[in-house]
């Protein structure tokens, strides 16, 4: 079957379906006339008519709203020239150039979010060219039915198809009478498909919190009253039902995003006042968002708080010093670090206890050495020990001064005992021995009778030495008294003559023994 025969059959079906709607005759031959920059049609009766309002997306609207075969008829002129159908009606019809229609109308349907808004004058010129290119397939109505707008037809087509059946159509006011409606009905399509706006603090939370927040905001937006936007009244023409139903659809006008955010914030504040009693403890990031309600995921702040408490407890147990009797055992920590800390603390406490025990033992021994010491404090006991040692040193010095002669430690004692003069003096006094141990008696000769015990000293040429306490006389000669075993002393001076005789008889030995004494002192 040729393509024009198929078109003729479909045109007959279309005319039979549209007989109930009054329409002007469309079978008359018309001419295309260019007048004042616009294309118009002129019939045989010389009546000039203006081009109907732009119908860029009439085919898309009929496909969505009606669901009938009119879409096939409207799409056939894309590939079939009108000359094939016009030859059967009038042979004198002048063929026209096959002009390809503009694709802006179709791009606005599929790429509505991307395409830029088009002015009304450009749409009228494009639609006029498309309509005059195929004059036999365009149907004009006298105001009862007109092609819906591109944006509103796509926005409302699915609802009309599901509510009123496949044989219903929409009748919206012409876009030419109110050209500002085009820009007002484009923006709601963009904002209606997007999820509701979320506050800035919601972006800082996990995805699960954001999901519940979006759902709650969506419910709140549906329940909250909004300001009355622009209202379009649409008249529905039923093919089977004789009743006319008027459908009021509110299309939200395009408002700035800042105003929408302000509305959402005000709604959130109202909702928060109502649900302040039901607020759940949340983290610092989500504070102030009590409208979210109880979240599905577990609270992160509670876990963090619980772990911090456990760490503080473990640290306090490690630092606390345990007493000897009441000793606490550190609780089992969940981490290996806590167990290591507890072990190190136990070892440290054990070593400290042992050190304190040793110190206590030494202090008890010192307390026993100090007479009449009843102090318990360590500092007090040490003070008592210091005072006692000072008193002992003073007593030793007094006893050494009372003996009458006190020589330096380098002369009195060997080099090994020079550091302990007081102890050596006390030892000599306790044994009944004089200070000048190892020094010869200068007042007597070698044949003189020694009254004390004698012993030989190395380096002294094996001469007997009398142990006596020497005294310094005025003439520089040593004249001392010998010590008797019972501790009594005998004066050797006697009378004056005896003293002179003793001195004369001992002059030579004195010189000889002085040299030996000098030799001992030099060797020492």
UniProtKB/Swiss-Prot annotation:
It comes from the Eukaryota. Transcription factor acting in the phytochrome signaling pathway. Activates transcription by binding to the G box (5'-CACGTG-3'), particularly in the dark but barely in far-red light. Acts as a negative regulator of phytochrome B signaling. Represses chlorophyll biosynthesis and photosynthesis in the dark. Recruits the histone deacetylase HDA15 to the promoters of chlorophyll biosynthetic and photosynthetic genes. HDA15 represses their transcription by histone deacetylation. Promotes the expression of MDP60 to modulate hypocotyl cell elongation in response to light and ethylene signaling. Changing residue 186 to K: In strain: cv. An-2 and cv. Su-0. Disruption phenotype: Inhibited submergence-induced and ethylene-dependent underwater hypocotyl elongation. Signal peptide: none annotated. Gene3D superfamilies: Helix-loop-helix DNA-binding domain. Residues 343-392 form the bHLH domain. Homodimer. Can form a heterodimer with REP1 and PIF4. Phytochrome B binds specifically to DNA-bound PIF3, but only upon red light induced conversion to the Pfr form (PfrB). Reconversion to Pr form causes rapid dissociation. Interacts with APRR1/TOC1. Binds to PIA2; this interaction may trigger the repression of PHYA-mediated phosphorylation. Interacts with TOPP4. Interacts with FYPP1 and FYPP3. Interacts with HDA15 in the dark. Associates to PTAC12/HMR/PAP5 which acts as a transcriptional coactivator. Binds to PhyA. GO terms for cellular component: nucleus. Phosphorylated by PHYA; this phosphorylation is repressed by PIA2. Dephosphorylated by TOPP4 during photomorphogenesis, leading to subsequent degradation of PIF3 by the proteasomal pathway. GO terms for biological process: de-etiolation; gibberellic acid mediated signaling pathway; positive regulation of anthocyanin metabolic process; red or far-red light signaling pathway; red, far-red light phototransduction; regulation of DNA-templated transcription; regulation of photosynthesis, light reaction; regulation of plant organ morphogenesis. Residues 343-358 have a biased composition (Basic and acidic residues). SMART domains: HLH. It is found in: Nucleus. It comes from Arabidopsis thaliana (Mouse-ear cress). Residues 149-163, 173-194, 284-300, 483-507 have a biased composition (Polar residues). InterPro entries: bHLH_dom, HLH_DNA-bd_sf, PIF1-like_bHLH, PIF3-like. PROSITE patterns: BHLH (PS50888). Residues 38-70, 141-194, 239-259, 281-358, 483-524 are annotated as: Disordered. Induction: By UV treatment. Repressed by red (R) and far red (FR) light treatments in a phyB- and phyA-dependent manner, and via a PTAC12/HMR/PAP5 regulated process. Up-regulated by abscisic acid (ABA), ethylene (ACC), auxin (IAA), salt (NaCl), cold and heat. Follows a tenous circadian rhythm with slightly higher levels at the end of the light phase. Pfam families: HLH. Residues 40-49 have a biased composition (Low complexity). This is Transcription factor PIF3. The gene is PIF3. Sequestered by PhyA from its target genes promoters in far-red light. Keywords: DNA-binding, Nucleus, Phosphoprotein, Phytochrome signaling pathway, Transcription, Transcription regulation. GO terms for molecular function: DNA binding; DNA-binding transcription factor activity; identical protein binding; protein dimerization activity; sequence-specific DNA binding; transcription cis-regulatory region binding. Expressed in stems, leaves, seedlings, fruits and flowers, and, to a lower extent, in roots.
């Amino acid at each position: 079957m040729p393509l024009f025969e198929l078109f003729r059959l479909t045109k007959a079906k279309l005319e039979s379906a549209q007989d109930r709607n009054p329409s002007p005759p469309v079978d008359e031959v018309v001419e295309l006339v260019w007048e004042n920059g616009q294309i118009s049609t002129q019939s045989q009766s010389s009546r000039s008519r203006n081009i109907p309002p732009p119908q860029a997306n009439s085919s898309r609207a009929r496909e969505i709203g009606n669901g009938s075969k009119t879409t096939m008829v409207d799409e056939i002129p894309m590939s079939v020239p009108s000359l094939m159908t016009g030859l059967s009606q009038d042979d004198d019809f002048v063929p026209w150039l096959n002009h390809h229609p503009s694709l802006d109308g179709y791009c606005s349907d599929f790429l509505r979010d991307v395409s830029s808004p088009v002015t009304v004058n450009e749409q009228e010129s494009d639609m006029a060219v498309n309509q005059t290119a195929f004059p036999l397939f365009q149907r004009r109505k006298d105001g009862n039915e007109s092609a819906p707008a591109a944006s509103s037809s796509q926005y409302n087509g699915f609802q009309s198809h599901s509510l009123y059946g496949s044989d219903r159509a929409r009748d919206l006011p012409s876009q030419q009478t109110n050209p500002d409606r085009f820009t007002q009905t484009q923006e709601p399509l963009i904002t209606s498909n997007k999820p509701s706006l979320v506050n800035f603090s919601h972006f800082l939370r996990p995805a699960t919190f954001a999901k519940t927040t979006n759902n709650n905001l969506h419910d709140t937006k549906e329940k909250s009253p909004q300001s009355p936007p622009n209202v379009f009244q649409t008249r529905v023409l039923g093919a089977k039902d004789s009743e006319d139903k008027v459908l009021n659809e509110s299309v939200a006008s395009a408002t700035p995003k800042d105003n929408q955010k302000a509305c959402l914030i005000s709604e959130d504040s109202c909702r928060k006042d109502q649900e302040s009693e039901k607020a759940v403890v949340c983290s610092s990031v989500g504070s102030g968002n009590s409208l979210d309600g109880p979240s599905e995921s577990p609270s992160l702040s509670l876990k963090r708080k619980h772990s911090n408490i456990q760490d503080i407890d473990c640290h306090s147990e490690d630092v606390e010093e345990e007493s000897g009797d009441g000793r606490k055992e550190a609780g089992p920590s969940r981490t290996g670090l806590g167990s290591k800390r507890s072990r190190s603390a136990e070892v440290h406490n054990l070593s400290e206890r042992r050190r304190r025990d040793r110190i206590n033992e030494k202090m008890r021994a010192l307390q026993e050495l100090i007479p009449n010491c009843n102090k318990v404090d360590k500092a007090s006991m040490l003070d008592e020990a210091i005072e006692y040692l000072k008193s002992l040193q003073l007593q030793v010095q007094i006893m050494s001064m009372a003996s009458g002669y006190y020589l330096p430690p380098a002369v009195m004692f060997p080099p090994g005992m020079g550091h302990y003069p007081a102890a050596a003096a006390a030892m000599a006094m306790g044994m009944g021995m004089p200070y000048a141990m190892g020094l010869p008696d200068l007042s007597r000769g070698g044949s003189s009778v020694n009254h004390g015990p004698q012993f030989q000293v190395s380096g002294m040429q094996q001469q007997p030495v009398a142990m006596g306490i020497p005294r310094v006389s005025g003439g520089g000669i040593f004249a001392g008294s010998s010590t008797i075993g019972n501790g009594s002393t005998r004066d050797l001076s006697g009378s004056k003559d005896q003293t002179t005789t003793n001195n004369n008889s001992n002059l030579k030995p004195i010189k000889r023994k002085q040299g030996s004494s000098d030799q001992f002192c030099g060797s020492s």
